[in-house]
Amino acid sequence: MTPPGGAARVAAVPPATAPRASVSVPVRGPLPSTEDLAATQTSYDTVAGSYAALLEDELDARPVDRGLLAAFAETATTAGLGPVGDLGCGPGRVTGHLASLGVDAFGVDLSPGMVAEARRRHPDLRFEVGSILDLDLPDGYLGGALLWYSTVHTPPAQLPEVFAEVHRVLAPGAPLITAFKVGDRQVHLQHAYGHNLSLQVYWTPMELVTDLLDQAGLVIDARMVCEPAPHEKQPQGYVMAHRPA
């Protein structure tokens, strides 16, 4: 799900062969408690309708996002290794976009309210309640996985667990694309989308994300950082990877 703050659009693409800087932020810090996860779920249940209405047409003004999603869709459909999971799908906005590109896509989200909104808006697609930490999917089931700002409420210390689970459910050769906030900070939101809520939001260094994906056994294919748009405060990061065959 896209968190409060949106996504930036001015692309800066480092060469694929450029060496990576060393990771400046170790994977440390507390893991989320049961109460933290419940607060995230409840918050998105509360804002589901407002969130879906506000972001319904967001991709129309996001050519970079559409281009990256098109590249991912082409990779997944060409490989033809199975259905594509939009993991942390929110109200199904990106799931529906992938389906419009010919992808056999379905969505999973922690929030029952978001899943209900997704089913209402996209009755022809499948959406299920579930956690990206423990997906109810067989090993190697997915022909592609999307983590579109799905980890912004996940502390860095828990990212290895998320990426290991994604590796488990991806078929050998299947692609992954992830989008996230780039940086080294966290904030606690108490109001967004016209509602009171409780959400912890994390910014993560690009080098940390790519290193952790690599450690999970995934091969990095491309990475990109977009500078903040005028109304935004942080860069956005995108990584495409795949599980090796």
Where do the language-model regions lie?
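A short acidic, Gly/Pro-enriched loop at the edge of an enzyme's catalytic core
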Residues: 133-145
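Short alpha-helix
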Residues: 201-216
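Core SAM-dependent methyltransferase catalytic element
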Residues: 228-245
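Class I SAM-dependent methyltransferase SAM/SAH-binding core
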Residues: 82-87, 91-134
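A short glycine-rich, Lys/Arg-flanked "PGG" loop and its adjoining helix->strand segment in the class I
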Residues: 160-172
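Conserved class I S-adenosyl-L-methionine
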Residues: 25-79, 184
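Short, glycine-/aromatic-enriched active-site segment of Class I SAM-dependent methyltransferases
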Residues: 182-200
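Conserved beta-strand signature within the Rossmann-like core of class I S-adenosyl-L-methionine
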Residues: 173-180
